[in-house]
């Protein structure tokens, strides 16, 4: 039995950034932490996940857990660690005749230690109230009720394996359901060995969460990304793209630099261009939007900061004769080109009829309807980010301010520029909020396309409806764009991105289907 113990909610600091969720549901690498934890379970061992009884698991998370044969155990709220463990084991109905693996819900490892009757240990890195390893045979493990003053102590870090789980339950029960006291009793009865852990990552506190997340990202970073505790360096074989991003950061007006990480310069080494930014211990909005449970009023503050940035973009004077990204280049021209490419690859035509939600519609009609509602009139020219979507926006909860990364910095024909029509950035922001792009990228959808009939379900949670409506009103008040404008621009974006997702047919199908979903919303706005 492999039990992931996530039967309590995250602490107050983490709750302020991610909402009231169990630790195993925290975001990590655009997935939930439990998806990484389940992968640690030895092959052939049944996996269980304990959760607070009051926590409502979303349908899509339920489906993932069922698909990976993970059994949820709902334990009463407010139990101590020891009582929660005993409750989980009793509720599970497990025979307790086979070895028991226990993993804390806020913990991850590169790999699990090997052995029977073991306690995984690490050296303390931070000053928290850890349980420490001692030389005392009676109290082999001790709870430290005050922050530790030095770093040399070994602490238990969240993985255990017991050969006699029934004896463990007896020991914890006899210790008045105190987990550490129960472990000491088991140590005297059966014996436990301390084993050094391999790649321990702790997500239980806000500081350790961000440090562990940085370490996790570093371990899985592409060759083109170098991450240290202080900076991140980006490079690519696509030199022109990196040079354009560096140009944007290098030339950004001083008034706007509060909205980016500190820019640390670029270099050209043996023909390979790279640049560095300060590494920020913050979460990107795509992970917050999909995986957190933040109330609508927090989202309104986040979006207000994003709009503040875009308003500041609009205030910047455009240099005479500078290349400019115009709306027609970024939408109509690019959409037509990319859509033709997609149709050719799929062996379909723009005039083919598709059925979605009981209506027959062609791609050509969707393009025409969206074209009709694209913003017209005077361009909103200023500094253009060019890819202002949730995955490129970080949020600092302490400062109530966004930080943005990965700008475009050039025109479609390759000219470096800071400038463009910021309505394109509004479209990119909309395609995250209204278009639910990040839910699709995270795999939180169901799509079926057969005989030109399209079915799409995105697992978006209902509490985002208020956030979406607030966003539409905020954009209309600030920039004069209507809901129709926003949906029309998104449709163009989703159609134009289709060839870029050819590496994943199912995801490409979902993005394709989403254009039909957005088109239906656009039609309803017209009625």
Model-predicted segments: where are they?
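N-terminal nucleotide-binding beta1-loop-alpha1 segment
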Residues: 1-21
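Conserved alpha/beta core of the MobA/IspD/sugar-nucleotide pyrophosphorylase nucleotidyltransferase superfamily
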Residues: 2-6, 96, 153-229
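Conserved beta-loop-beta/alpha segment of the NTase-like Rossmann-fold superfamily
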Residues: 61-137
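Conserved core of the sugar-phosphate nucleotidyltransferase
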Residues: 108-186
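ATP-binding glycine-rich loop module of kinase domains
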Residues: 220-250, 285-292
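Conserved kinase catalytic-core helix
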Residues: 288-338, 351, 363-377, 491
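Active-site acidic catalytic loop and adjacent metal/ATP-binding pocket
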Residues: 368-420
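Active-site activation/catalytic loop segments of kinase-like enzymes and analogous catalytic loops
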Residues: 410-474, 491-506
């Amino acid at each position: 039995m492999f039990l992931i113990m996530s039967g309590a909610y995250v602490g107050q600091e983490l709750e302020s950034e991610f909402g009231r969720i169990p630790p195993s549901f925290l975001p990590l690498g655009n997935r939930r932490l439990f998806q990484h934890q389940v992968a640690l379970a030895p092959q052939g061992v049944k996996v269980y996940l304990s959760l607070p009884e009051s926590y409502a698991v979303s349908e899509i998370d339920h489906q993932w857990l069922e698909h990976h044969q993970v059994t949820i155990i709902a334990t009463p709220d407010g139990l101590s660690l020891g009582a929660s463990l005993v409750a989980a084991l009793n509720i599970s109905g497990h025979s307790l005749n086979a070895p028991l693996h226990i993993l804390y819900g806020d913990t991850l490892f590169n790999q699990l230690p090997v052995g029977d009757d073991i306690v995984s240990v690490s050296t303390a890195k931070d000053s928290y109230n850890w349980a420490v390893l001692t030389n005392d045979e009676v109290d082999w493990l001790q709870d430290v009720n005050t922050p530790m003053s030095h770093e040399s102590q070994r602490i238990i870090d969240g993985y255990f394996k017991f050969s006699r789980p029934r004896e463990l339950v007896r020991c914890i029960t006899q210790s008045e359901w105190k987990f550490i006291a129960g472990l000491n009793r088991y140590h005297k009865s059966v014996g436990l060995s301390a084993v050094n852990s391999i790649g321990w990552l702790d997500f239980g506190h806000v500081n350790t969460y961000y440090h562990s997340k940085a370490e996790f990202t570093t371990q899985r970073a592409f060759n083109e990304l170098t991450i240290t505790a202080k900076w991140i360096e980006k490079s690519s074989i696509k030199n022109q793209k990196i040079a354009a991003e560096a140009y944007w950061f290098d030339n950004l007006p001083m008034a706007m630099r509060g909205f980016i990480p500190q820019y640390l310069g670029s270099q050209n080494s043996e023909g390979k261009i790279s640049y560095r930014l300060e590494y920020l211990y913050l979460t990107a909005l795509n992970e917050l939007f999909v995986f957190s449970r933040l109330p609508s009023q927090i989202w309104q503050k986040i979006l207000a900061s994003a709009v503040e940035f875009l308003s500041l973009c609009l205030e910047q004077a455009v240099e005479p004769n500078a290349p400019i990204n115009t709306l027609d280049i970024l939408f109509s021209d690019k959409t037509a080109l990319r859509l033709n490419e997609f149709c050719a690859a799929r062996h379909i035509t723009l005039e083919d009829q598709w059925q979605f939600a009981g209506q027959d519609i062609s791609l050509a009609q969707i393009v025409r309807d969206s074209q009709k509602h694209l913003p017209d009139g005077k361009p909103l020219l200023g500094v253009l980010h060019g890819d202002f979507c949730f995955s490129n926006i970080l949020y600092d909860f302490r400062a109530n301010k966004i930080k943005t990364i990965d700008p475009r910095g050039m025109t479609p024909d390759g000219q470096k520029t800071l400038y463009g029509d910021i309505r394109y950035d509004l479209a990119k922001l909309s395609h995250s909020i209204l278009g639910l792009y990040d839910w699709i990228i995270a795999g939180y959808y169901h799509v079926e396309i057969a005989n030109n009939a399209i079915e799409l379900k995105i697992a978006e949670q209902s509490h985002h409806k208020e956030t979406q409506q607030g966003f539409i009103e905020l954009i209309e008040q600030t920039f004069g764009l209507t809901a129709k404008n926003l949906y029309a621009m998104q449709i163009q974006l989703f159609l134009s991105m289709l060839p870029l997702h050819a590496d994943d047919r199912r995801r490409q199908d979902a993005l394709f289907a989403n254009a039909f979903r957005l088109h239906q919303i656009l039609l309803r706005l017209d009625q």
